[in-house]
């Protein structure tokens, strides 16, 4: 889903460095360890990002002045080549909730380590995950296991959308908990992908 972007005027030190061209790649920004607090930084360094709205929920709350309704949007973004982000946004307008979710996802973008971790394959290409990883959110746990080339994404539709935008083509997926909850299923899948960059090959962090 495409939204017209406003002209970005950086306000943080990192944003000003990006605008000045001091970073050659997004990897350099991540390696610097500086927190990303502006979505414009991500837009500037990863212009090929695609966003996918996973669900929109109506939330009601009773107040002294009556019932108030807000919408919650859950969004995943990625460039289908090793970067993925997950975000939520709330607002009284659906469109604004989606925009907030996209911005939140950009601030939560992570690099996904890909590889060929299946003993059945060994092609050496970056089509799967390099090791088994698990992510959790609420009652949901999602475990990603390396799969040989050609297997595809063995998971539900929500998981497929998250994995596809991350650039994963083949993976076995085990789940537990209430996976019918789109928010937790998507977030657990995202958290599992984030683990690929936190766990060293060999199993130790």
Curated annotation (Swiss-Prot):
The keyword Lipid metabolism does not apply. GO terms for cellular component: cytosolic small ribosomal subunit. GO terms for molecular function: rRNA binding; structural constituent of ribosome. Keywords: Ribonucleoprotein, Ribosomal protein, RNA-binding, rRNA-binding. The keyword Translocase does not apply. The N-terminal domain interacts with the head of the 30S subunit; the C-terminal domain interacts with the body and contacts protein S4. The interaction surface between S4 and S5 is involved in control of translational fidelity. With S4 and S12 plays an important role in translational accuracy. Part of the 30S ribosomal subunit. Contacts protein S4. This is Small ribosomal subunit protein uS5. It comes from Methanocorpusculum labreanum (strain ATCC 43576 / DSM 4855 / Z).
């Amino acid at each position: 889903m495409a939204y017209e972007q406003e002209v970005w005027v950086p306000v943080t030190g990192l944003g000003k460095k990006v605008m000045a061209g001091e970073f050659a790649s997004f990897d350099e920004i991540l390696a610097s360890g500086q927190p990303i607090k502006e979505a414009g930084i991500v837009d500037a360094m990863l212009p090929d990002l695609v966003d996918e709205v996973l669900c929109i929920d109506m939330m009601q709350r009773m107040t002294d002045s009556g019932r108030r309704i807000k919408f919650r949007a859950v969004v995943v973004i990625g460039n289908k080549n090793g970067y993925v982000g997950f975000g939520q946004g709330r607002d009284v307008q659906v469109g604004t909730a989606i925009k907030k979710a996209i911005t939140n996802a950009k601030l939560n973008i992570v690099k996904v380590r890909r590889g060929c971790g299946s003993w059945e394959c060994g092609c050496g290409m970056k089509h799967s995950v390099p090791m088994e990883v698990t992510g959790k959110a609420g009652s949901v746990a999602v475990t990603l296991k390396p799969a040989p080339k050609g297997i595809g994404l063995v998971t539900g539709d929500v998981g497929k959308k998250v994995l596809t935008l991350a650039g994963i083509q083949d993976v076995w997926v085990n789940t537990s908990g209430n996976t019918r909850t789109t928010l937790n299923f998507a977030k657990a899948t995202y958290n599992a992908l984030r683990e690929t960059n936190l766990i060293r090959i060999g199993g130790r962090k």
